[in-house]
């Protein structure tokens, strides 16, 4: 990231859906998302953020949607130092996601296991059903069309 953002959309990004991800930001990230163009034209439009888990462990991260059009935020969970949902969000969640070991580091894909929800996590049965549900989660576990927030359907690695 060039300006300290976790997600950057610069230019004419159109019709994208950012769905069922787990984002963990440390003190190095200033904004969760930055959307802008230098001249205000050809901006990002028709973007949906749905069922994502945003954990901010550091700065008071925000969304900076400078000149985007038709951004939709649905059923995202916010936890950490920044717990304020995006403006106009439908069904936001602000609760501890109860992850296995958030903030831990590791090597490669094994580090992802620290960000898996525990069995009591509120992310496991929340969220908006996606229009086209993924067949599997990050680890290859079947989603069986269930709704969930974040990248993992449950704590079991396949």
Language-model features: locations:
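Predominantly extracellular beta-rich ligand-binding scaffolds that present long acidic/polar faces
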Residues: 1-114
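Surface beta-loop-beta hairpin patches that serve as ligand-binding interfaces in beta-rich domains
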Residues: 111-114, 118-158
């Amino acid at each position: 990231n060039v300006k300290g953002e976790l997600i950057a959309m610069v230019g004419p990004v159109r019709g994208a859906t950012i769905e069922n991800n787990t984002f963990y930001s440390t003190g190095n990230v200033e904004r969760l998302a930055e959307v802008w163009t230098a001249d205000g034209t050809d901006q990002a439009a028709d973007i949906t953020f749905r069922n994502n888990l945003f954990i901010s462990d550091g700065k008071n991260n925000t969304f900076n949607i400078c000149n985007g059009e038709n951004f939709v935020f649905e059923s995202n969970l916010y936890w950490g130092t920044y717990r304020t949902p995006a403006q106009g969000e439908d069904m936001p969640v602000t609760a501890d996601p109860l992850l296995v070991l958030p903030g831990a580091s590791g090597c490669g894909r094994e580090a992802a296991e620290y960000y898996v929800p525990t069995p009591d996590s509120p992310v496991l049965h929340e969220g908006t059903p996606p229009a086209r549900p993924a067949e599997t989660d990050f680890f290859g576990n079947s989603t069986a069309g269930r709704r969930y927030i974040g990248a993992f359907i449950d704590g079991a690695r396949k």
